[in-house]
Amino acid sequence: MKLPVREFDAVVIGAGGAGMRAALQISQSGQTCALLSKVFPTRSHTVSAQGGITVALGNTHEDNWEWHMYDTVKGSDYIGDQDAIEYMCKTGPEAILELEHMGLPFSRLDDGRIYQRPFGGQSKNFGGEQAARTAAAADRTGHALLHTLYQQNLKNHTTIFSEWYALDLVKNQDGAVVGCTALCIETGEVVYFKARATVLATGGAGRIYQSTTNAHINTGDGVGMAIRAGVPVQDMEMWQFHPTGIAGAGVLVTEGCRGEGGYLLNKHGERFMERYAPNAKDLAGRDVVARSIMIEIREGRGCDGPWGPHAKLKLDHLGKEVLESRLPGILELSRTFAHVDPVKEPIPVIPTCHYMMGGIPTKVTGQALTVNEKGEDVVVPGLFAVGEIACVSVHGANRLGGNSLLDLVVFGRAAGLHLQESIAEQGALRDASESDVEASLDRLNRWNNNRNGEDPVAIRKALQECMQHNFSVFREGDAMAKGLEQLKVIRERLKNARLDDTSSEFNTQRVECLELDNLMETAYATAVSANFRTESRGAHSRFDFPDRDDENWLCHSLYLPESESMTRRSVNMEPKLRPAFPPKIRTY
């Protein structure tokens, strides 16, 4: 069957912060850009980012990008690439002021400058006292960012395809990515989007876990598309568990609460973080705080509740006025999902899957990388990745709060700037044969033809339970090996799952089944990677290997999809403008 073809200079898949920032840059340069999103752009998951954008503006105290870089490298447990971290921290202020000029409604200090709040893992002067570096728009910073970028994309005539679901990348015989096939959810029409550059900006995949702060759309579509196209994924064992998800609901409670002066309590009313991180206390790195809460619970000091043991986040001492001006969204979320009024009593919280530090390895310019036989980096022609799906890697083994929005804006912009030049240089569109395009429809055809078999909902539930039980905050070799075997069985079950709804118009079950394929690819890569790394570093914490092992593991892990095997990739320790930060013991 010959598909209808739409041609563009670039196609961006995903309309969150990174995708919209990249699309904006491409459209501003006069190139044609298609922006595909399976939801309306302002409903992308960036909208849930609450706390702010960490950037060294120096509005509340003297600050400097090198201090920010030090904190980020330390936060990453030293497997963040220092050239990329340097680029992000150095260009951050410029990228944020551009947003301000686009009309992003930041909260303000009395003198009119952008308000900045303290966040976890921030310090002055390379590990000195607590810094306030996170620029915020109340506790709705992601919401403000998305609306600003959406309006700018409309103004600059980006062609937006809302409620289109990308099926798979189209690769030609030369191994170049030449666009993607996508399904219009409203009509069921399938179109081949042919492009000189394809940018994956599909976001995270927290839905591989049972309990997550992520939206239902975070299904790892980009990870699945990359793996099926033979592109490796990096550091997939590194999943951040946010210390404060509402117990029982998984809804995020921003770190900004602790930045404003909130703190955690156990069932004895003790402020327990003082024991685990005597200096930073409740504003230690997220992996440290999440583990501390889990240890309190394991040792019997968790608070009891209908959702099981949890910790309490105390905010009432801040007063109604501060909460209403600085954290209005949190008041609303707590009242709705925890049935608690934070003005009067603490919020029940538990560590909840939040962020994927791993993803497609890329250069600072967003160009996707693979490795050749000699283990050298090679660019995948025509493919780019930005945002949470990319592993540049500025976050390493643990992301600092507020750095994700910075990552979106800085690297979305960087990919767009690179594409302005590279698209012009490339000349004619690369071609794909009809069989190349057909190959990208294999999954869709499989689901459309599977009328008998198991209910996919049961398979998804089994996958999420397996991940939650075996690959959570604390991990252990035997449990992870067992988890991997379970996933192999679940993967076989998935091949024989059925699609009940055969309609073409607004068939949400078909989309959910296609998403389940991507969840499976993501979960499997995570499990293999987690079994591979025999140490504890950042978010990857093992009972059987409790120590960090720099001699063997100061490196990225790389999952190779063709062989389903693992290899190592070295960390970049060569920033351009200053000496590298050598690995040290990480204390807060």
UniProtKB/Swiss-Prot annotation:
UniProt-listed Gene3D superfamilies: FAD/NAD(P)-binding domain (3.50.50.60), Fumarate reductase/succinate dehydrogenase flavoprotein-like, C-terminal domain (1.20.58.100), succinate dehydrogenase protein domain (4.10.80.40), Succinate dehydrogenase/fumarate reductase flavoprotein, catalytic domain (3.90.700.10)
Bilayer topology term: Peripheral membrane protein
Keyword Membrane: yes
Subcellular location: Cell inner membrane
Regulation (activators, inhibitors): Inhibited by oxaloacetate.
Keywords annotated in UniProt: Acetylation, Cell inner membrane, Cell membrane, Electron transport, FAD, Flavoprotein, Membrane, Oxidoreductase, Transport, Tricarboxylic acid cycle
Documented effect of changing E186M: Allows recovery of protein cross-linked to SdhE, SdhA is flavinylated
Binding locations of FAD: 14-19, 37-52, 221, 388, 404-405
Active site feature: R286 (proton acceptor)
Catalytic reactions of this protein: a quinone + succinate = fumarate + a quinol
EC numbers on record: 1.3.5.1
Enzyme class: oxidoreductase
Family the entry assigns: Belongs to the FAD-dependent oxidoreductase 2 family. FRD/SDH subfamily.
Name under which the protein is recorded: Succinate dehydrogenase flavoprotein subunit
